[in-house]
Amino acid sequence: MAVKYDLTQTLLPYLDRHLGLPLLSHLAGSGIFSETDIAKAQYELAKNTSMVDYALQLYEQAYPNQPAPAEIEKQRENAIALNDKLGSEVDHVLEVIQDPSVASALKQDKAQNLQWLEEKYNLTSEQINALYRYGYFQFSCGNYGDASSYLYHFRVLSTDPVLTMSSHWGKLASDILVGEWEQALSELKLLREQLDSSAAHVTASYAQPSTSNGSSQNDDLTQEGLLKKRAWLLHWALFIFFNHPGGREQLVEMFLSPVYLNTIQTTCWWLLRYVVAALLLSRRTTRVYLVQQPAPATLMASVSGANVNKLSPQQAIKDIVNIIDSESYRIAGTDPIVDFLSKLFVDFDFEAAQEQLTLAEQVASKDFFLADFKDELVEACRVVISEAYCRIHSKVDIADLVKRLNLSKEDGEKWIVNLVRDTRADAKIDFKEGMVFMNPTHPPVYQTIIEKTRGFTFRTSAMGTAIDRKAHPPSLNNTHNLNGNDKRGNAGGRGGRGGQRNQGGQRDRSHAHNNEAKREGESASAEEAQQQQPAQAIAAN
């Protein structure tokens, strides 16, 4: 059973080999696979890194009483030589950046900084790139703390967009592997912004006529490339969200955002296990989830400028249940944690939900990310079952409910008492009759109206933006104008409708209407009429 529901082999293709090693180490103590097979898998991951001693140790575990391959010793010699070579290349760079006066003199403009460093310290871009290579070599050796530091300083100085993006991934992996969860979370947000910025480039490139004559595009500037990188980011984010104190809430907020939810449904639907688990774990401690929506003006889910949709835990469960129902053709029966929610809220089958809860507890105990939350997850599942059961019954048999919760009679009675007390439910417990009497409650009318109309504002804004974009197709220049300096639509702006804009960004048409009234009350000469005719045509639009 455990082998059937284990996701390790599914997750590994989306992880760096260094991130995959902890997952295999966790499997070694789970009893799902033999230790020899796990050691062989660990060796296959480690042998192409510069962790020569660790790879040799794994080889001895995987292939006992066999001589070590000759390439391991050769790999050791190459690693020592490369370390000396790269170390000498970065000596001058490290000497410069460790000078406090240099750090205080650096500006926001990287090109200006590079020119200043070259003039004053004879520091070239090639020497700065050596810092990148040395950082990745340290990462390959398993020195993750040093790698994080070197890649950070490289990113501060470098003007190379490709290497800068690569350094983001390297620093994120390094921070994860040393357990710096605050830094890793900050790096995750930065990398997410970089991917969203790339999405704007993709939108602009698709809006422009093709000039590549069939040549291949940069992988970062294709929809397929962005989809692949977002899938990687979702998998890497699991390490952070299940270790950071507030990670479960943030996992729900990120994974339920439209861009990443589409990624999950398209390429990695197995991550729904962790969405469901995070939602169940956080629903009683979170009043509202702040889910970012795509920013209509730029057609991307920008972290800094996105619209935020507030979801209550109840609404979040409804949304994820709808997604599970739509994906049931390929996920039904593949994951007990997901099936638990499906049986409970789609099929309303309490007996089947009880069976899935038993399986879910076993799966969570073996899962790398959920093992530490097994007891909390089972408790959250029991709360969900009891809430659903009591919602449709006015009189609940305690013995029957305890059975559905997989508890003994004594533990079940204590659990029900604590639940009624903690949730402040309007209920009366009669132990003589063995019943719980529920007093039905209904939400206020105004709360129901708010829930029904919550998304109207965003949908109206998106519709208006779509109409405006249809009339004024985006160009490469105005798509990248994220600083609010877009002149399209301003008075005299290219392709605009005329009229001044007020501080809220809306077109002020009163000025145009006053001009029309003034012109109607005056008799203009033929020459004046010819001059005013274009302005009237613009204002009329």
From Swiss-Prot:
Q: Where in the cell is it found?
A: Cytoplasm
Q: Where is the composition biased (Gly residues)?
A: 490-502
The biological processes this protein is annotated with in GO are: formation of cytoplasmic translation initiation complex; translational initiation
Q: Which domain of life is it from?
A: Eukaryota
Instruction: Report if keyword Cell membrane is assigned.
Output: no
Q: Where is the composition biased (Low complexity)?
A: 523-541
Q: Which Pfam families match?
A: eIF3_N (PF09440), PCI (PF01399)
Protein function: Component of the eukaryotic translation initiation factor 3 (eIF-3) complex, which is involved in protein synthesis of a specialized repertoire of mRNAs and, together with other initiation factors, stimulates binding of mRNA and methionyl-tRNAi to the 40S ribosome. The eIF-3 complex specifically targets and initiates translation of a subset of mRNAs involved in cell proliferation.
Give the matching HAMAP family: eIF3e
Can you say what this protein is called? Eukaryotic translation initiation factor 3 subunit E
- Which source organism? Mycosarcoma maydis (Corn smut fungus)
